[in-house]
């Protein structure tokens, strides 16, 4: 049991709105759970279904087996692709090995994949703005065989060398800092005036909304706690947004990670959560902050999200068939 020393005496807790799960994460988790209900364990999941330790451990306890590469799954097994998406090479490998696939790629990531295919088919080279090594970036870069470049900073743009400067397009990772992505996109357009931009921003609605909510939250607080795992891109961006507003901010996996010293003398403590962090963790953090002396909790005004994505047709069809037999 955690100690209840008082370090945040009489502080107010402010909750960002919106926060936590997005439609793509809800859908991805639902796909794994439904696959387990239909087929039983084990269900193999390539990479973490979403970047949250609590979610991954919960699904592991239900029978999901998380693997790094497809050759770790037996031939013919059921495999779920994570919400971050996969390359064409991974899809080809799954087909060659006879794996039965449920694709949990976020539809907003799939939108970027379609843009890449369309632009490459038109003969354009593509610059992707994103973080090297992130699964989403690897999946998007793997939608084409060559003709793609990755940049992360304005400095990367200055150093970029492309084959055909007059025939370029760009796309972005969906979970970037809105402000950082805008700066890099601006640098691309300044250096390559004819570069084709996405018809609609590739940064997803949930990333945008959660960053906007923190921009409203941070000026009201002297500390912001962001609930999310360290490998979550969008959660890290929320911490950065708060820090850029001049507020101390920490990224935490849950209530157990709170250092009471952080709360010493704080009068207003903001709490938000990345798009892959469940609300149960937020409420545990609120309870812990109350134990440490906070006396009130208030939710900031903000957007009420109503976005929902359907399950893959193959999975929803099997669910319907099963339910019709009951």
Curated annotation (Swiss-Prot):
Dimethylallyl diphosphate binds at residues 51, 84, 134, 232-234, 276. CDD domains: lytB_ispH (cd13944). Its EC number is 1.17.7.4. Pathway: Isoprenoid biosynthesis; dimethylallyl diphosphate biosynthesis; dimethylallyl diphosphate from (2E)-4-hydroxy-3-methylbutenyl diphosphate: step 1/1; Isoprenoid biosynthesis; isopentenyl diphosphate biosynthesis via DXP pathway; isopentenyl diphosphate from 1-deoxy-D-xylulose 5-phosphate: step 6/6. GO terms for biological process: dimethylallyl diphosphate biosynthetic process; isopentenyl diphosphate biosynthetic process, methylerythritol 4-phosphate pathway; terpenoid biosynthetic process. The active site is at 136 (proton donor). Its cofactor is [4Fe-4S] cluster. Keywords: 4Fe-4S, Iron, Iron-sulfur, Isoprene biosynthesis, Metal-binding, Oxidoreductase. It holds the Pfam family LYTB. It comes from the Bacteria. [4Fe-4S] cluster binds at residues 22, 106, 204. (2E)-4-hydroxy-3-methylbut-2-enyl diphosphate binds at residues 51, 84, 134, 174, 232-234, 276. Binds 1 [4Fe-4S] cluster per subunit. It catalyses: isopentenyl diphosphate + 2 oxidized [2Fe-2S]-[ferredoxin] + H2O = (2E)-4-hydroxy-3-methylbut-2-enyl diphosphate + 2 reduced [2Fe-2S]-[ferredoxin] + 2 H(+); dimethylallyl diphosphate + 2 oxidized [2Fe-2S]-[ferredoxin] + H2O = (2E)-4-hydroxy-3-methylbut-2-enyl diphosphate + 2 reduced [2Fe-2S]-[ferredoxin] + 2 H(+). Isopentenyl diphosphate binds at residues 51, 84, 134, 232-234, 276. NCBIfam families: ispH_lytB, PRK01045.1-2, PRK01045.1-4. Belongs to the IspH family. Catalyzes the conversion of 1-hydroxy-2-methyl-2-(E)-butenyl 4-diphosphate (HMBPP) into a mixture of isopentenyl diphosphate (IPP) and dimethylallyl diphosphate (DMAPP). Acts in the terminal step of the DOXP/MEP pathway for isoprenoid precursor biosynthesis. HAMAP family: IspH. This is 4-hydroxy-3-methylbut-2-enyl diphosphate reductase. The lineage of its organism: Bacteria, Pseudomonadati, Pseudomonadota, Betaproteobacteria, Burkholderiales.
């Amino acid at each position: 049991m955690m100690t209840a020393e008082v370090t945040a005496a009489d502080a107010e807790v402010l909750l960002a709105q919106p926060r936590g799960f997005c439609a793509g994460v809800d859908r991805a988790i639902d796909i794994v759970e439904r696959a387990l209900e239909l087929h039983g364990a084990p269900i193999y999941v390539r990479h973490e279904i979403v970047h949250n330790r609590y979610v991954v451990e919960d699904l592991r306890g239900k029978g999901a087996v998380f693997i790094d590469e497809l050759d770790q799954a037996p031939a013919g097994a059921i495999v779920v692709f994570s919400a971050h998406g996969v390359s064409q090479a991974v899809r080809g490998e799954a087909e060659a090995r006879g794996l039965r696939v449920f694709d949990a790629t976020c539809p907003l990531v799939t939108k970027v994949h379609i843009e890449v295919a369309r632009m490459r088919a038109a003969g354009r080279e593509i610059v992707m703005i994103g973080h090297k090594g992130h699964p989403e970036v690897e999946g998007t870069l793997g939608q084409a065989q060559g003709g793609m470049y990755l940049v992360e900073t304005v400095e990367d743009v200055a150093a970029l060398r492309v084959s055909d400067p007059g025939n370029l397009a760009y796309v972005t990772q969906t979970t970037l800092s809105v402000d950082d992505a805008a700066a890099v996109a601006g640098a691309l357009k300044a250096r390559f005036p004819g570069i084709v931009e996405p018809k609609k921003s590739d940064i997803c609605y949930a990333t945008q909304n959660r960053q906007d909510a923190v921009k409203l939250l941070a000026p009201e607080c002297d500390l912001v706690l962001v609930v999310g795992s360290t490998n979550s891109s969008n959660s890290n961006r929320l911490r950065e947004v708060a820090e850029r507003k001049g507020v101390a901010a920490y990224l935490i996996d849950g209530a157990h990670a709170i250092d009471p010293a952080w709360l010493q003398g704080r009068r207003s403590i903001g709490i938000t959560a990345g798009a892959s962090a469940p609300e149960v963790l937020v409420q545990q953090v609120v309870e812990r902050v109350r134990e440490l002396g906070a006396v009130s909790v208030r939710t900031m005004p903000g957007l009420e999200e109503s976005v929902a994505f359907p399950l893959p047709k193959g999975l929803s069809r099997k669910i319907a068939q099963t339910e019709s037999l009951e």
